[in-house]
């Protein structure tokens, strides 16, 4: 028998990786079982978008492996990806709806008891109708969704809320991870998502990581970065972070900086480029405008907070005024290497070495960033400022030169951003505040004019505040564990969920912290149990077919959304004057208006893929995934967000939009690569009316909360390689749980010694908002500098978000999980 290279990779990659990690061999490395059907899928975890091969036997996923035909991961998976087959089969998987009850009826303080789906939707409909009939009813219902929703789940939810209930109180958990990236793109370019792609990795000369531990959070991309660094002569890697982590092992220019001073470092780089006369004058003259951003914008806290007082531009944080290049030059001139070195704690020679990488016109640079930038009280600013650097040099929109925002969730791009499940967005970068955009959406959705509410809904952090204040009363959480992952859960999150005025529904496959705080839990189908689509960080849309049997364990989010819509007649949710504009809708349900509208329901069951069980199609009598996708795609076709026909994605390993005439786009905004840039235009940032990107003058600003004599340490939160987000899936995989069973507090040995602590001691970590008990680790993979501690958030037994502050970027409304003040003492 002979093995092809592809077969060799399939046979050896999994056991080799498991052995290297010291874990038990995954199922795929065991002797092959008979009658296993293999098909392509997409990894359930981060935003890299790795393709996997999924093995199914008797309706159960029994094995997965990296897909050798994938252009993203090329046959590899990270350690989480190799155990994907086990995430759906935890012993505590939920199978029936559960309602808090006492004496046979709902009671907010009752115990969870199983009920039927009809009973669940009946009480949900009762609670929603009770709120919607109030004069301000549209503000009293809300939903918190997910960057883990499939594309059509997010789209269906957006239609239900923004069109059906006429409420924009829909926001995704991507608000906590990607909102600053979105705001940064929109402010600088007028259009969202990266202009480059992963192919940049193999064509660049230097990598700069800003607040990104790619070695653990995006390990497959890191393997490609490592390969480039080790095989391309002269290739350099710079890593900037507030603490040392595994990505530092490859760093030629390692930099640990004081929290929040990345703002100053970015301005120093611009100053260096201009002072050395290294900037690309021709590019700037043709393709850039300069803007002075508003300052004194606050910290996104409650208006009564002391930090929100006397903030002149808190109401208009996105404001920007024109300025000249010379004015920008003068603005950044104060950020000298001496000043920034003192402020940031980074030696001057390292700052200069970093600036030289960007300033050398012969060196192609890829800048990667993720939560260290985005989860920041000035998250939009730092996104704008990294674009400043690339735009000054013209190092953008071409192979190997790319500012690249990495994504944390599998479809934060494809669902949250592109579909527009944020409280202010519609599909294809449209927004609810724009009259023309609302008209387009109403036309696409076949709705009467004036249906969509022009008022922005409650964003994620505001939703918790409104729940606590009793102003948001019927609330549905789907595909996310927000009680564990949202900030300041003691003061804002938990009180809101348990407010007697509120009815909280959580759809989840497992009894998470969030589910256990709810009033009603709906069991959901997971991953390969349903037909799905994700969009990854490089604009790649990928599909998969339904492989497992979901109906016996739970119902998909899509089915739940569409089925719930049947409980509402138009007369119960729309005012009479709106119905009068389209009287033929009178008497119809929201299901008929939104999903059986002649567009979503136009694809019959005969178009389903043979050999796959589609529970939603069986339930509704048509192919809803195809209908929803094609209706959604109509928003972006011809508007630089073009998606290919539905069938194309089931055949391909994903396509990067815009897809025009069957061809995907690798680099946007540059002639020869982007079909929306005409011959002779060279570079065109067509998201802006004049085709020019914006460079912003934005200053250093201190953090919302810093260490003081009472709380003397910075706290930063984040993840580890073996677990993903809140651990609700990975902690149910025995091998992953065994490898890292609990979170620890990473601490500098000197900080431990000052407190008479030793490695492994049990400690109490306290902030002004709460406290947790954990163990300290002074010898681990993460090595904080003195004065800072780091703790992951995957462990539900140690809820680190009891400690965090709910400060946000005032522009993006994204939470800063990286900076608050704590004290540590022996427990």
Swiss-Prot record:
The entry's keywords: 4Fe-4S, Electron transport, Iron, Iron-sulfur, Metal-binding, Molybdenum, Nitrate assimilation, Oxidoreductase, Periplasm, Signal, Transport
Parts of the chain that traverse the membrane: none
Cofactor: [4Fe-4S] cluster; Mo-bis(molybdopterin guanine dinucleotide)
Gene Ontology terms, MF aspect: 4 iron, 4 sulfur cluster binding; electron transfer activity; iron ion binding; molybdenum ion binding; molybdopterin cofactor binding; nitrate reductase (cytochrome) activity
Residues bound to Mo-bis(molybdopterin guanine dinucleotide): 80, 148, 173, 177, 210-217, 241-245, 260-262, 371, 375, 481, 507-508, 530, 557, 717-726, 801, 818
UniProt remark on cofactor binding: Binds 1 [4Fe-4S] cluster.
PTM field: Predicted to be exported by the Tat system. The position of the signal peptide cleavage has not been experimentally proven.
One Pfam family per UniProt: Molydop_binding
Keyword field contains Iron-sulfur: yes
Subcellular location: Periplasm
Binding site for substrate: 793
Example of a GO biological process term: nitrate assimilation
EC category: oxidoreductase
Keyword Transcription regulation: no
Enzyme Commission identifier(s): 1.9.6.1
PANTHER family associated with the record: PERIPLASMIC NITRATE REDUCTASE, RESPIRATORY NITRATE REDUCTASE
Function: Catalytic subunit of the periplasmic nitrate reductase complex NapAB. Receives electrons from NapB and catalyzes the reduction of nitrate to nitrite.
Family per similarity comment: Belongs to the prokaryotic molybdopterin-containing oxidoreductase family. NasA/NapA/NarB subfamily.
Assembly and binders: Component of the periplasmic nitrate reductase NapAB complex composed of NapA and NapB.
The name this protein goes by in its record: Periplasmic nitrate reductase
Gene that produces this protein: napA
